[in-house]
């Protein structure tokens, strides 16, 4: 058993190293920010991705984006998360050391970005920030099948989830995920043997998962139906036992019970 676990861990490490190498080959988006978080400059990658977001969500032409609060270029539901990232300091209180990257979904255009913010310091102290991001959309998603006659493009379908662990970004295969548990702006991703913390919200994930496989059974829980073990009824409530290491009992809301039973083929 130990040898198989060791082999699995080694394979996972190799995948992480391969992805890390790919990430290093990317041309990153770079945004210079003043001390108030307003845009001073973009590189071409950042302008290509964030420019359309500003035009479509704010009605601001690309040449008028300079001086704008960078938080306004992101979806409203992501703004508190990004604002926290921009204002964060190192746990030891150092204003220059920066927090780990976060994954963020940008709906206009439909992109997944890994964002890192680094504080910049000069002779007079902190003088602004540099926001660096990598567009990992093509490594983590694929186009959704579009119903005939649909006027609004469907969100891209996820097949991997980017997370940050041990000073590196790794990708979790969706097929290995047993369940997702939401907690505010963050989500715990649970596999058979591991737990990972993601900055993607359950709402972001739900839009981009196959609804025939992944079901939001509760406001705080999305489950992968192939990993469902047993439905347990307790008084007036129903729990779903999942095949993770703890055999976790996930609460099922009343509004989802009938749909869950139908998908599981339970009478």
UniProtKB/Swiss-Prot annotation:
Gene Ontology cellular-component terms listed: cytoplasm
Signal peptide: none
Keyword Iron: yes
Record-level Gene Ontology MF annotations: DNA binding; metal ion binding; phosphorelay response regulator activity
Cofactor: heme
Entry-linked SUPFAM superfamilies: PYP-like sensor domain (PAS domain) (SSF55785)
Miscellaneous section: This protein undergoes a ligand switch upon reduction; the heme distal ligand is coordinated by a Cys residue in the inactive Fe(3+) (ferric) form, by Met-104 in the inactive Fe(2+) (ferrous) form, and by CO in the CO-bound active form.
Name of the protein this chain belongs to: Heme-containing CO-sensing transcriptional regulator RcoM 2
Lineage: Bacteria, Pseudomonadati, Pseudomonadota, Betaproteobacteria, Burkholderiales
Gene: rcoM2
